[in-house]
């Protein structure tokens, strides 16, 4: 199972925490909302988020390059815990925390602004889109070579509910006839 995510997407954080509680194992790979939205006119708050997306994507790519793809999951959880749950801004201080958390020796906070990692981020992003079969946002989930957008979760299910949700998603993703399921994020 592979979770493709943009590190600054709040819905991806919910999905990642759900999978961590419900799945035996899953990989985390990068997709990039910054790459997805290249060339589009965006309002200022979204432009700022895309800047964070690009910078954190570089850091994750650098850590993956140094430590291997497994490090991206650990780095993501170290980052997201501070970024989402503690409202930390993308900064050298946060990057240093992530680098230290995964035990990197070569990667530093300078990776946030190192454009040499942009190609690796773009390559991973395009792999996510290829796995999905069309343009899609974050998160994407691959189960048994079938990739879907989502699930978009507005919170993290309780442990028993999380296991049930994972089984339901596995069944849906595995059904060749299944295409899409959606409801408003603010449903009653």
Task: Please give the residue ranges for each predicted region.
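C-terminal cap of thioredoxin/glutaredoxin-like
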Residues: 19-20, 92-188
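A short linear-motif detector with a strong N-terminal bias
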Residues: 8, 12, 118-121
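Structural alpha/beta surface segment adjacent to cysteine/selenocysteine redox centers
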Residues: 4-7, 13-95, 168, 172, ...
